[in-house]
Amino acid sequence: MKYDFKVSDKKWQDIWEEQGAFHASSDKTKPKFYGLVEFPYPSGAGMHVGHIKAYSGMEVICRKKRMQGYNVLFPIGFDAFGLPTENYAIKNNMHPREVTDKNITHFKQQLKRVGFSFDWTRTVDTTEESYYKWTQWIFRKMFDHGLVFRDKTLVNYCPSCKVVLSNEDSQGGKCDICHSDVVQKSKDVWYLRITEYADKLLEGLDTVDYPANIRMQQENWIGRSTGAFVNFSISGTDEKLRIYTTRPDTLFGVTFMVMAPEHPLIDKYADRISNMDAVTDYRAECAKKTEFERTQLVKDKTGVCLNGLSAINPITGKEIPIYISDYVMMGYGTGAIMAVPAHDERDYDFAKKFGIDIVEVIKGGDISKEAYTGDGEMINSGFLNGFTNKKDSIERMLEYLSEQGIGEKGVQYKMKDWAFNRQRYWGEPIPIVHCPKCGMVGVPYEELPLRLPDVKNFEPGEGGESPLAKIESFVNCKCPKCGGDAKRETDTMPQWAGSSWYFLRYIDAHNDKVFADPEELKYWLPVDWYNGGMEHVTRHLIYSRFWHRFLYDIGEVPTAEPYAKRSAQGMVLGANGVKMSKSLGNVVDPNDVVDQYGADTLRTYVLFMGDYGSAAPWSDTSVKGCRRFLDRTAALTDMIKGTGVT
């Protein structure tokens, strides 16, 4: 008889559910396998075939491991806090809770129709109080251990979403959520000191099985560099302008300095700067620009010389001008740089525009035409003259800096501390109380979760303040430390919070005493294999490794790294080879494929599209080919069983 996928799909999916066929066992004598996929954000659009490809690979691995006798944990959940849901709720006059529940129901229906072997008894939802209680608990632990701080600073701000964005969430000068232009705004920001874990995150990569491209992206994101901190005296003062450089060997070629327009020394010595009006105007222009706009390499170089303020090159003793320019940022390095125009393209362009001296210190190019950025013999460099090995010349300069007390070897990171707050409603409330007497005080652990109040108006204020700031019953409270009048923090956590530890909650999803039982953690950790998208191998993967390593350091988890192995599937493109998009009308709904060809056909096709790690276009013709293959397989099975099908 002909293979009837509708009958077969329902039959086996019902049997699996009735028998709890995919529930992880409590038998810890069996070898374990923890297979993890990135849990989805339950958007109103529902799942797309990209989700199916992401999950189908791990699905095959987990089914094989079960056949081999492993105790398999293959869970699923929903990363449900976040701005898209809130924006949709505002637009459609609904509550985010209602939107979230509706979307999760739809996602569950889709996932079950495809027949994935998830353990549904361990499903988590990051918006449930029983879950975000422990998200807040981990934040409190970080606060107690000095990894949380608050600072007023210029931030990336989305006027459309009315929310502060991290650098990671505003790449290209665009909001990662709504894609509108980002502006700079001064705000109080909560930060997590992820930079304190930079070396541990790098060292941890030596202990895990990550593909070379994923490891490289993580290393580049953290961006560890070794160089030197050097002090340049400001002429006529006792002040030192401290810079960081990875090329201390080129100090003889420094002919000017550049400071960030926000540098505090500008205001400190304003009375010495004769063109302060021009400086003030330029600073005002810079304040309107986003970080992306300020740091683009291809843009025209702009700046203003600080007339009346100059620096002394500590190696040559020569007086050199100080400029301010928008491409130098206070949040990077020290907020000032030394400029070696002969051997840096950006410095070269700047020097040419402003008529600044260019001194060649590395032989090999023609500096009358362009900067020379290669290696070569050191020239015009005093005690370094004749050196041809860059490493040797750097080491000799480091020795000299130390001997003279004008600098020292140092390390810097490209990664910055993690901006960790949003001025929106649909997120985890930050469990901090502000007391006039005691300062910032953590909400007591026994009072967690700090619940998100149920409100009717959850739109942010025009000034960008959180909707929670308008709820007096939430804001006004007593200080947990002194008992005096205090106010609760009204910002919420970013969407990245809940996804930074969800793999731990799967292990013991219903425990209300701890986020997971230590014995369960000991058995199941680390995750044996984690598969997800390449778009998450920096932010999410680094953030979750950071949270896990912190929990390891305070004795809450038994492993230093959360994931033993990581892989990434390629994107499923539209039939025209372009990324699937509603606006382009090339999105494929998995429900449509299941209706027409069956769940097995869909899962088979996404596994045979090509190299699993590469992008591939959708092909209806190939889907039909997979259906014919399964028809022949079913016919062969029937023939072997003697049912007469030929």
Positions of predicted regions on the chain:
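Conserved oxyanion/phosphate-binding beta-strand-loop segments in alpha/beta enzyme cores
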Residues: 1-36, 66-75, 99-106, 282-323, ...
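Residue patterns forming the tRNA-binding/recognition surfaces of aminoacyl-tRNA synthetases
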Residues: 2, 15-19, 91-241, 248, ...
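Surface-exposed helix-capping loop/turn segments at secondary-structure junctions
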Residues: 20-25, 70-71, 114-119, 145-148, ...
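N-terminal catalytic cores of NTP/NDP-binding nucleotidyl/phosphoryl-transfer enzymes
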Residues: 25-94, 100, 123-138, 245-246, ...
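Conserved active-site neighborhood of enzyme catalytic/cofactor-binding cores
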Residues: 42-73, 175, 332-362, 427-436, ...
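Catalytic alpha/beta core of large soluble enzyme barrels
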Residues: 58-59, 71, 263-366
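Nucleotide/phosphate-binding sheet-loop regions of phosphoryl- and nucleotidyl-transfer enzymes
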Residues: 182-184, 194, 252-281, 377-380
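A generic structural motif
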Residues: 231-235, 312-314, 573
